[in-house]
Amino acid sequence: MSRPHYNEIAMNPELRRFPFVQLDVFSSRPFEGNSLAVFPDGRGLSDQHMQALAREMNLSETTFVLPRDPSIERERGVRVRIFTVKEELPFAGHPTLGTAFALRGSTGAADVALELNVGRVPVRFEESAGQPVFGEMTQAEPRFGLIHDRETVVRATSLRDGDIDPSLPIQTISTGLPFTIVPLRGLDVIRRLQVDLVKSSEYLRQTEGGTSFYFVTRETVDRNARLHARMLFYGGEDPATGSAAGCATAWMVAHGVAKPDERVLIEQGLEMLRPSRIFVRASRLDNKVVNVRVGGNVVEVVRGEVSF
């Protein structure tokens, strides 16, 4: 996507105002989880404007809601577009949950459906007295891809011999976006991760393994968690990756780490001091993993307005 010229954005004869809300997703407390900016009415914004605003917000993702006729929204869902600072995404987990939370607003709706570039994604909310609101999205049916050779992945990531858990497979799975799940031996291994992102990205490109590895270990900080996870990328680390967590959920149920329909906790973001709690579950039907659900809490931290 070409970079918009400054004058295209700034030199507008009429000043326009676009409210936004900033949320922390997969946390019940501010300043934890994964941050998200939501523009609840993006009508009138071009693709270039949306990309420029995502860069301005400088978060892992920013979403733009495009309201339309209520009858269409009831049938197809509320139209939402997701942008990183560099590009538009067809799907991402924490933007889906956070945007649905923002749309729910004061109505208290139990169900919110979004129409993303990947298709319709339903989100259901649960409320209990004295507890923060909990939202759970249903992701796309899992597609199981390549099971990778351990030694090849060690070379592609610059891991050490013996870092990978030999009892579980390294596998590419997609529930909307593909990720390659890499099981590691323990917390000591996952905490000292220093991945060669150039080599690993090239390997994933060649094997159609998605854009990122999702590193997990069954040794956890919270004894109630089932997995401890990290997701590294160029320029940093993701504190909570809902799309990858969906892939890991399908992987857990397929390989016996979690039982069908058992809701389990994935902890992520601890190494970057943004602890996140991602609750996941999936079903089995005719020996296939189906109905992958990813949920958590959301908290509002900022309200503001962008003018140009």
Language model segments and positions:
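Active-site proximal loop and beta-alpha junction motif in alpha/beta enzyme cores
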Residues: 3-91, 97-308
